[in-house]
């Protein structure tokens, strides 16, 4: 669904809509879902429709949005559902949104890495961000589109160009890494998964995914062998799903759950309920890298406080150190894409 940014912005302008910075009432939050008809978008839309905190769910995609919206609108929850299809309707979809969730893009297939998606998905995120900058510059933007390590810098650079960038309002959704870690740890140790907390820091691809097993709650001891097996399994969990689906897609259902959980956390923050989530954001938590995922405190303005990585083991510190060059490469690729286009 990649269209030139100028095309999207011009289409919005031609529709007679004008840029405003007024956000929806925090008492009646509007959530815009961009890529709503896709493999992640549809189950994510289903979960957002059931979220009692969402007052207006605006669905956007380049095709098939009316059908998804009609289907979801028959669910007996209070969220109003609107459908927006194609670039001429993107502006209305995101206008005055409190939260914008972006799963739009092509999925991984067997043999592909998240970075292989760059050429297609980079353009999609750039073009969406260009319209968001005009229609809803105060929105909290949650980016699911891979490669997240690069697409977050892409969106940020577009917003910088437009003069509306606020680093507290742009997020890479790494919640799935947390969800997977908590599932795998609870399975291994026989914990109640709903009460297991595993912080995951770094980024959202390969060696940049760093589960902090030393910080698991409730406090849990792991053998070196368990750590050496569990860490790469968490890092490669996405590939595990891609291979299991044998060409039929990537992690859509678990990603939808993770996306809905993070969107709900953002909405709760907007409404004044501060909470802590891991997210990939502009951060100085780790020296030598501009974006890094750590636990952050969410509130009315997005990131209220970056909580950092905390006390880590020697093994985890080695993983963090090794992730920095890889993250910098991913970030530079995203920045260069915007500057070169």
Swiss-Prot record:
Pfam families assigned: Ldh_1_C (PF02866), Ldh_1_N (PF00056)
Active site: 204 (proton acceptor)
Catalytic temperature dependence: Optimum temperature is 35 degrees Celsius.
CDD domains per the UniProt record, alphabetical: MDH_glyoxysomal_mitochondrial
GO CC term (a single one): mitochondrial matrix
Function: Catalyzes the reversible conversion of (S)-malate to oxaloacetate in the citric acid cycle.
Protein family membership: Belongs to the LDH/MDH superfamily. MDH type 1 family.
Name assigned to this protein: Malate dehydrogenase, mitochondrial
Species of origin: Caenorhabditis elegans
Lineage: Eukaryota, Metazoa, Ecdysozoa, Nematoda, Chromadorea
């Amino acid at each position: 669904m990649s269209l030139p940014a100028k095309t999207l912005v011009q289409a919005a302008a031609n529709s007679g809509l004008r840029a405003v910075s007024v956000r929806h009432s925090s008492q009646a939050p509007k959530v815009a879902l961009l890529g709503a008809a896709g493999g992640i978008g549809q189950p994510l839309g289903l979960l957002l429709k059931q979220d009692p905190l969402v007052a207006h769910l605006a669905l956007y995609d380049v095709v098939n949005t009316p059908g998804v919206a009609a289907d979801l609108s028959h669910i007996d929850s209070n969220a109003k559902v609107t459908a927006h299809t194609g670039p001429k309707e993107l502006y209305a979809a995101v206008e005055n949104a409190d939260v914008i969730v972006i799963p739009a893009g092509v999925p991984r297939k067997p043999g592909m890495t998240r970075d292989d998606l760059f050429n297609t998905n980079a353009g999609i995120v750039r073009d969406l961000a260009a319209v968001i900058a005009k229609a809803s510059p105060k929105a909290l933007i949650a980016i699911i589109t891979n490669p997240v390590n690069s697409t977050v810098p892409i969106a940020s650079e577009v917003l910088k160009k437009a003069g509306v960038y606020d680093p507290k309002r742009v997020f890479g959704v790494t919640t799935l890494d947390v969800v997977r870690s908590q599932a795998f740890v609870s399975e291994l140790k026989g914990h109640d998964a709903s009460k297991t907390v595993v912080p995951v820091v770094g980024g959202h691809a390969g060696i940049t995914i760093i589960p902090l097993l030393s910080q698991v709650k409730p406090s849990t001891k792991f053998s070196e062998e368990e750590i050496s097996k569990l860490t790469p399994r968490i890092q490669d969990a996405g590939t595990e799903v891609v291979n299991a689906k044998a060409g039929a897609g990537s992690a859509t259902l678990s990603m939808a759950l993770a996306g809905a959980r993070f969107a709900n956390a953002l909405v709760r923050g907007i409404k004044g309920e501060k909470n802590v989530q891991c997210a990939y954001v502009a951060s100085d938590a780790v020296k030598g890298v501009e974006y890094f995922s750590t636990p952050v405190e969410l509130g009315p303005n997005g990131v209220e406080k970056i909580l950092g990585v905390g006390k880590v083991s020697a093994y985890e510190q080695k993983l963090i150190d090794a992730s920095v060059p890889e993250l910098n490469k991913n970030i530079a690729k995203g920045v260069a894409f915007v500057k070169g286009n």
